[in-house]
């Protein structure tokens, strides 16, 4: 059905099974009937930066970047930009303007993460909105159960990032969102059956009505 997907392995061991990519917007469903263009662009990333408030203050980041262009019915829709280093994988979407349409509303992400069978979880359930101190929930860390089983969805509202998983005795998987600013909303992780987790946007009622649960891109 032309649905973009990806998978992640480390030393031939699966850590993320085949998982979907894509965006569903108010100008089109870009999660299916997509075509991968052949001109994949590859770049080497070599950056050094310093931060005073992290465990490793001096960071030398070396990665390979791959830019994968997707079209639909002959029109360029978006790039999925992956960066792969020795210890992490990151990706983001870059939308293209559609003729005179220079902005869109993202109604839903098709981004998903399918964990290997037997993985266990260390996840903080997200609270319902408009509760807690000054009605600021979900703004606090909640209790989590170590080595819990998959197939749950917290207290019904998913989980708050970062989300930690143990891939049996093979290693650990940390899923989080990074680099989010005021141009996009913060998200959560929604749990489903068979090791499937998907991106969820904010709940209705969060932030006392400030902001939106459907981010816009321009």
Each PLM stretch: what is its role?
Residues 1-218:
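N-terminal accessory beta-strand-rich subdomains and adjacent acidic, glycine-rich linkers
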């Amino acid at each position: 059905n032309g649905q973009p997907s990806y998978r992640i392995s480390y030393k031939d061991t699966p850590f993320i099974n085949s998982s979907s990519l894509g965006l569903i917007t108010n100008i089109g469903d870009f999660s299916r009937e997509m075509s991968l263009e052949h001109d994949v662009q590859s770049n080497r990333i070599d950056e050094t930066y310093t931060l005073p408030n992290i465990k490793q203050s001096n960071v030398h980041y070396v990665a390979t970047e791959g830019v994968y262009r997707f079209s639909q019915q002959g029109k360029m829709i978006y790039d999925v930009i992956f960066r792969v280093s020795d210890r992490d994988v990151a990706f983001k979407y870059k939308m293209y303007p559609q003729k005179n349409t220079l902005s869109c509303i993202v109604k839903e992400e098709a981004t998903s993460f399918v964990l290997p069978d037997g993985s266990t979880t260390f996840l903080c359930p997200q609270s319902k909105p408009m509760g807690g101190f000054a009605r600021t929930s979900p703004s606090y860390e909640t209790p989590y159960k170590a080595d819990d089983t998959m197939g749950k969805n917290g207290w019904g509202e998913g989980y708050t990032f970062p989300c930690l998983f143990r891939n049996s005795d093979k290693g650990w998987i940390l899923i989080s969102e990074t680099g989010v600013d005021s141009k996009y909303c913060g998200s959560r992780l929604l749990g489903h059956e068979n090791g499937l987790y998907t991106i969820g946007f904010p709940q209705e009622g969060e932030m006392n009505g400030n902001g939106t649960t459907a981010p816009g891109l321009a």
